């Protein structure tokens, strides 16, 4: 039936998942973080409630990755903040996102 279709995989912004997200800030630099409530976290960045991005607004959500395991999300966030992780991020996901 038409209304019975279900998507497989993670549902966008579902509280059962942990999210690693990448923002582009007004200074054309990136910010990488992780959270379980992506909508709330992005809203907090946009309001200026997050010290790391408060003076770098407006922000734009560039991409996010969903993980069912918190530790995997945290490890991926840490990796993206390393030199090799940033190089992969810049090469594979974006034309240019600096630190």
Model regions and ranges:
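GIY-YIG nuclease catalytic motif and its immediate N-terminal context
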Residues: 1-50, 57, 64-82, 86, ...
């Amino acid at each position: 039936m038409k209304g019975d279709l279900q998507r497989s995989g993670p549902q966008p912004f579902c509280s059962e998942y942990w999210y690693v997200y990448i923002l582009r800030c007004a200074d054309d630099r990136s910010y990488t973080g992780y959270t379980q409530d992506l909508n709330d976290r992005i809203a907090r960045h946009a309001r200026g409630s997050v010290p790391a991005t408060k003076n770098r607004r407006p922000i734009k959500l560039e991409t996010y990755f969903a993980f069912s395991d918190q530790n995997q999300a945290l490890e991926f966030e840490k990796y993206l903040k390393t030199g090799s992780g940033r190089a992969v991020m810049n090469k594979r996901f974006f034309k240019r996102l600096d630190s």
